[in-house]
């Protein structure tokens, strides 16, 4: 086995492990959600359409070219289009996680959200792991406009909320994207737990210090 083949096999196993962990801990249910990562050769490895994140076969993961051509493995999800849009427009993005996790999806269904940043920072981890979290308007799943909107937002952001749909998070590795996704989900949960109670938000100075 070549060095490249060994790296690819390791990444396949990592994707399967992380996906299974999401499923086992209730971040994903049924066949909802999809993950992807960039391979060293520029191709994309992604979870197949209709697959359960808790029961993936490393050898059946979808391999997709940078132009969207399906190369091998099972058929990729139609949502791989917006994964590609993120990779093309943010060179730091090496992996993407999209889930329908409970708390973040619930947050995406609320009216009156600030579309430029749905989460006003109240913990340092929101700032350090995610930064701003812009809202993408609702479109039917698979609609090309999701990819178009994410492409416009990708350069300056790494976490997004699809209205009435769920979260999308990038990372410089699949593990980092997974960690960022979990931080987003736990932050959304805190928003609902806090409810109408007065929240002590971080000041502009505190946010600037975290970003420096």
UniProtKB/Swiss-Prot annotation:
Reactions mediated catalytically: 3-dehydro-4-O-phospho-D-erythronate + H(+) = dihydroxyacetone phosphate + CO2; 3-dehydro-4-O-phospho-L-erythronate + H(+) = dihydroxyacetone phosphate + CO2
Binding locations of Zn(2+): 79, 98, 100, 165
Entry keyword set: Carbohydrate metabolism, Lyase, Metal-binding, Zinc
Gene Ontology terms for molecular function: aldehyde-lyase activity; metal ion binding
Catalytic center residues: 79 (proton acceptor), 125 (proton donor)
GO biological process, one term: pentose catabolic process
Matching Pfam families: Aldolase_II
EC number assigned by the record: 4.1.1.104
EC class name: lyase
The record's free-text note on cofactor binding: Binds 1 zinc ion per subunit.
Gene Ontology cellular component list: cytosol
Family, similarity comment: Belongs to the aldolase class II family. AraD/FucA subfamily.
PANTHER family assigned to the protein according to its UniProt record, in alphabetical order: 3-OXO-TETRONATE 4-PHOSPHATE DECARBOXYLASE-RELATED (PTHR22789:SF0), FUCULOSE PHOSPHATE ALDOLASE (PTHR22789)
Purpose: Catalyzes the decarboxylation of 3-oxo-tetronate 4-phosphate to dihydroxyacetone phosphate (DHAP) and CO(2).
Protein name stated in the entry: 3-oxo-tetronate 4-phosphate decarboxylase
Originating gene: otnC
